[in-house]
Structure formats: C-alpha cells, structure tokens
C-alpha cells in the first residue's frame, strides 16, 4: 500500500497591506485594542485579484518546488469559503485551467472553513493511499475581504486574504502519519455567512441586513475553539503514542493569539515549537495553516523530516488535527 507525503509547500499574499492604524480611520478601534485581543498587527488585502488568482500563484510555486512536471499532477482540490463564484464553476477548476494542467484533470472544491487544509490533507492522503491518484495539488485560498463587513469592528479587524498550496505525493518516507477530522453542525449559527445561499437568496433585503457577510459570536466561538482544539491534539497524540516533545513544530490555525496561547499552554508546547504568523496575516481561514508552514519553511526552521502537528477549528463547526513528516527538500537546497 502506498503512503502519502507532503513534498512541497508555497504561499502567496496580495501586495496591499491594511494595518491596525488604517482601521483606526475606518471604525471605532485602536491598534492597542486589536493587538491586545487578537495579536494581529496587519493583514493583506486583494484589490484586483480574486480567489483563483491567489490560489494559482501559490500553486504554481508549490509545483515548481515539488520537482514534478505539471503533467504529473492528477488532481486539484481547493478549500475556500470565498470562491470566485457562489455555485459554479469551482475555484479548483479555474486554478487547474490557469496552471495549464492536463485536460480532464480531477478538480473540485471543499468548504470546511478554517479547518479546510486539514480536510484537504485527509482527502489527498486517501486518494494516494487507495492508489487512485499519485500527485495531488491541494490549495487553501481566500479573498475574505469580499465577505467582510468593514463597518463591523468585531469581525473586520480579524481577516485577511491569501493562499497556501502543497503537493501531496506517493512516497515511502516522510509520510503523513495520521489525520483526524470532525464536525458539529448543531451550533452552526455562531459562525456563519447567512445570506446568498438557498436559505436567504440574494435580494435587496439580504443585502440591506448585511447577510452576505461573515457573522460571528466571538465569545462563544472562543470558548468552544480552545476546548475543542486542545482535545483534538490530545486525541491524535494519544492515538499515535506521542508526546508534545515528539513534535518539532506545532502549527495551529492562525485565528487569534489568545486562542493559540491558551491551546499551546494547555498542551505544554514551547514557544520554539509554535509557529506564529497571525500578527502579519490575520485570519486567512483555509489558507492559514499552509501559509504558516511556508513561513517556517522559508526561514529554514522546517526541514526535510521535520515532524509537524497541525490543528484547526472553523465554521460548521469543523475541526481537525494532523501529524506528518515534512517530505520536501530543504529550502536552502532549492
């Protein structure tokens, strides 16, 4: 039975930066207030680019770093909650076309919010272990600025745009060790984009009530996220007879520094183990984890064989954890 390995990672962010000081001119807030409560200092915002553009640029680099030819990629899966188009075509189809991948390639989207990248890993791993595919391109891409209400200070300060991509390939070394995913839709309305689907179709009333934007009950989500993320990590470590010290890098979803710190401290991860990018990117939903992996890869921390523990929680609710050995070449060797 073949095993699957993450053999390359890459990310892309748009050029424009929106700082906390910019928000001081837009809503009733301050840099001090935002940093203290979220850890976010800035975020990147796409002006002319759309989600598939962001995903294409990250994916192009991921393929290049993998050492594969584009013709060897046999599936493209994109996780996003801000697709180019509400219904169709999928963002993955557009990215595959933009990249000039094989005609007829398997391409589809998933929606798992901030847990999207871990769901992508599980799908890619399953396709490869089953023998159905050999090289799967996975992408978390978001233009969250298109679904953010910039008059709502409780949400607009949190989110940014960006994309992260990885190539998952059949390999006998540095394999994906384990992945756990889960969901609970009973509290879906605590983190939701209510409008423009079949529940509240696009209309003057939908737009008037700002139902086309992200709505979040922040305090409730915070409490559930900390408990759920901690439990998810404990379960996957226990299932694999591992301890926190067996992990080289803990890479949580970059939503809020208070959530990250609470989970890190509960699980006894050190500052050196924890990868943080929330200050410069904000919450980029499904792109958050691959962007964080890429940052630690490009600065030389993550190397071939590094053991990574990924952990995420998002709307749905969805959550999940993954343990894997990084299978790509060292950045210094590219």
UniProtKB/Swiss-Prot annotation:
Primary location recorded for the protein, binned into one broad class: cytoplasm
Pathway it works in: Lipid metabolism; fatty acid biosynthesis
Compartment(s): Cytoplasm
Keywords: Acyltransferase, Cytoplasm, Fatty acid biosynthesis, Fatty acid metabolism, Lipid biosynthesis, Lipid metabolism, Multifunctional enzyme, Transferase
Active site, UniProt feature: 114, 253, 283
Notes concerning its domains: The last Arg residue of the ACP-binding site is essential for the weak association between ACP/AcpP and FabH.
Function: Catalyzes the condensation reaction of fatty acid synthesis by the addition to an acyl acceptor of two carbons from malonyl-ACP. Catalyzes the first condensation reaction which initiates fatty acid synthesis and may therefore play a role in governing the total rate of fatty acid production. Possesses both acetoacetyl-ACP synthase and acetyl transacylase activities. Its substrate specificity determines the biosynthesis of branched-chain and/or straight-chain of fatty acids.
Protein name, entry field: Beta-ketoacyl-[acyl-carrier-protein] synthase III
Organism this protein belongs to: Campylobacter concisus (strain 13826)
């Amino acid at each position: 039975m073949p095993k699957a390995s993450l053999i390359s990672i890459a990310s892309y962010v748009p050029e424009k930066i929106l700082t906390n000081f910019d928000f001081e001119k837009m809503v009733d807030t301050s840099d001090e207030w935002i940093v203290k409560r979220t850890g976010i200092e800035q975020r990147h915002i796409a002006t002319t680019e759309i989600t598939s553009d962001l995903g294409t640029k990250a994916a192009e680099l991921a393929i290049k770093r993998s050492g594969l030819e584009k013709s060897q990629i046999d599936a493209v899966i994109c996780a996003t909650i801000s697709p180019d188009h509400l219904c169709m075509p999928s963002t993955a189809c557009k990215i595959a076309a933009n990249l000039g991948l094989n005609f007829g390639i398997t391409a589809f989207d998933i929606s798992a919010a901030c847990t999207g990248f871990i769901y992508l890993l599980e799908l890619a791993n399953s396709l490869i272990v089953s023998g159905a595919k050999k090289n799967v391109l996975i992408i978390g891409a978001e233009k969250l600025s298109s679904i953010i209400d910039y008059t709502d200070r409780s949400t607009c300060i949190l989110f940014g745009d960006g994309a992260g991509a990885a190539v998952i390939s059949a390999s006998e070394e540095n394999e994906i060790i384990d992945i756990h995913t889960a969901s609970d839709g009973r509290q879906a309305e605590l983190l939701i984009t209510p409008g423009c689907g079949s529940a509240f179709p696009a209309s003057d009333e939908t737009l008037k009530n700002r139902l086309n934007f992200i709505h979040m009950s922040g305090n409730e989500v915070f409490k559930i996220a900390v408990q759920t993320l901690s439990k998810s990590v404990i379960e996957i470590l226990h299932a694999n007879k591992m301890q926190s010290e067996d992990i080289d890098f803990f890479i949580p979803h970059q939503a809020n520094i208070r959530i990250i710190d609470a989970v890190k401290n509960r699980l006894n991860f050190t500052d050196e183990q924890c990868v943080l990018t929330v200050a410069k990117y904000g919450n980029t939903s499904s792109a958050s984890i691959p962007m964080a992996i890429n940052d630690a890869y490009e600065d030389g921390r993550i190397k071939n064989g590094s053991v990574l523990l990924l952990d995420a929680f998002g709307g749905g609710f969805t959550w999940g954890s993954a343990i894997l050995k990084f299978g790509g070449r060292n950045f210094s060797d590219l």
